[in-house]
Amino acid sequence: MAHAGKTRAVPPRAIIYSTGDRESPEAYEQFQDSMRGGFLPWSGKKIGDAKFRIRIEAIHVDDGFIGRVDTVDTLSVRTKSDISASSGEYVYASFNLFGTMTFEQNDEVNVSKPGDLVIFDSGRPARVSNQAARGRTCSGAIALMIPKSSFPHMDAEASFANVRIPRERLLTPLSNSLNLLTNRMPTAAGLELAAIYD
């Protein structure tokens, strides 16, 4: 299901949000309205003078999401108001493809380079900034949203509050799965993505 400038307040089966080649000065505000009105709201702002462009492709898998995000330099903020307006609690896992991502949560700051994985908590305030790689106009990441209920025997709040795993420390099976997601995300069918997600 494609959404032109808006998302629903419940988890949809699929989300495609793209500014395309639009150069409208309202493009960022339209995107922000979508993010604030979603089932897991975020706030934020654009950084710099570049025209705002973003593309999000995501699919609902089991009770979570797998997606790819390509964006110009932005700052995304998860406020207490955003958290209270959310319809669920998730663990985020962000696999950096290119560019630099800075995560601030739980009094920690983690800078993610390509190949790094950062895990953070939807139930705590957070700030995430994206900076394009040299020679590119965007940064890119594979993002997973996993319900906290998937970890019944773990203290999710203690275990997933802003943890960076550098690429050289990723376990081989996990690294292979993330790289497969990177390569297959644009064309894979839902069942195939679900198998990788599991």
For the regions a protein language model found, what residue spans apply to each?
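Short, flexible, glycine/charge-rich loop motifs used to bind or transfer phosphoryl groups or to couple energy/partner
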Residues: 56-57, 81-84, 108, 132
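A short glycine-rich, His/Asp/Glu-containing loop-to-beta-strand
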Residues: 33-35, 53-76
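Alpha-helical bundle regulatory/interaction domains
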Residues: 2-51, 100-198
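Generic structural signal for well-ordered secondary structure
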Residues: 28, 48-52, 59-62, 86
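Short beta-strand micro-motifs in enzyme catalytic cores
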Residues: 57, 65-67, 91, 138-142
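Glycine- and acidic-residue-biased ligand/ion/polar-headgroup-sensing regions
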Residues: 62-64, 71-76, 81-103, 116-117
